[in-house]
Amino acid sequence: MSGNLDVLSLKEDDVTKMLAATTHIGSTSVNFQMEQYVYKRRTDGVHIINLGRTYEKLLLAARCIASIEYPGEVFAISSRPYGQRAVLKYAHYTQATPIAGRFTPGAFTNQIQTTFREPRLLIVTDPLTDHQPVTEASYVNIPVIAFCNTDSPVKFVDIAIPCNTKSTHSIGLMWWMLAREVLRLRGKITHDRWEVMPDLFFFRDPEEAEKEQAAIEAAAPVIKDVPDEVVVADEPTTWGEDVTQTAMAVPQAKPLAVAGANDDWNEDDTAPAAPGAASWGGAAF
């Protein structure tokens, strides 16, 4: 399909990425409609996918996506947890509509539902796990693009992109390459290297992320709390001036009023006793 155009040919860098992500590894069984994409069969029974055919179908899918006038009418779907991050990233860069997680039955056929949508094109991660939107798309004549393994059913699938759909890295890499080709056809990026790395499309287990964060915190050096520095004023050269300035600066507390206070310590400061009350027994004689 790419012909002799060097721009559309498969680059060595892309082949290296595919091999590192195990995109070429199929399954032990093969669908009769996927036999045309199988390169050979290993001795252990695993089928090897032809990466040249994979890239050709990827370019064909990118041309179909770029032909849609409004990018929001392209729906990217993944009910498998390993492909949800890739779907969200793809929708972010291409302005598509993502459906990550469980697909609501009847979203394409039941107009009474609040989640009713009318997309012009569907892209699914795996037609085996995303069979519900693929089946509903066949009822309303919506074309479907799907990433298919050697054993994936291709019924109601218009464009099948052969790849390894059981590997988290393979799924993320294929979504990344599809987004890159779509942006190139739209003229958003050049045919040079795209600054977005494929790692952003890979699935990350939350538990593994927490373990990595804990390991980083454990390896970081422990910084003890350092007390604040005490600011000490410079000693004055003249003690008289310092005492005067300190006395003027510090407010003096008001003296407590003490009843009957005397300057002479020898005098008795005891207050005289109050006169006794009249006796209840009668008047004194």
Swiss-Prot record:
- Any one Gene Ontology cellular component term annotated for this protein: cytosolic small ribosomal subunit
Per the UniProt entry, the signal peptide is none
A Pfam family (short name) is 40S_SA_C
Q: Which UniProt keywords apply?
A: Cytoplasm, Ribonucleoprotein, Ribosomal protein
Start and end residues of each stretch annotated as Disordered: 262-285
Which biological process, per GO, is one annotated for this protein? ribosomal small subunit assembly
Localization terms from the record: Cytoplasm
Composition bias, kind Low complexity: at what positions? 271-285
**Looking at the record's lineage, which domain of life comes first?**
Eukaryota
Please list the GO terms describing molecular function. structural constituent of ribosome
Q: What is its main location?
A: cytoplasm
Q: Which Gene3D superfamilies match?
A: Glucose-6-phosphate isomerase like protein, domain 1
Please give the function described in this protein's UniProt entry.
Required for the assembly and/or stability of the 40S ribosomal subunit. Required for the processing of the 20S rRNA-precursor to mature 18S rRNA in a late step of the maturation of 40S ribosomal subunits.
State the family named in the UniProt similarity comment for this chain. Answer: Belongs to the universal ribosomal protein uS2 family.
Q: PANTHER family this protein is in?
A: 40S RIBOSOMAL PROTEIN SA
Subunit relationships = Component of the small ribosomal subunit. Mature ribosomes consist of a small (40S) and a large (60S) subunit. The 40S subunit contains about 33 different proteins and 1 molecule of RNA (18S). The 60S subunit contains about 49 different proteins and 3 molecules of RNA (28S, 5.8S and 5S). Interacts with ribosomal protein S21.
* UniProt-recorded name of the protein: Small ribosomal subunit protein uS2
Give the organism, scientific name: Anopheles gambiae (African malaria mosquito)
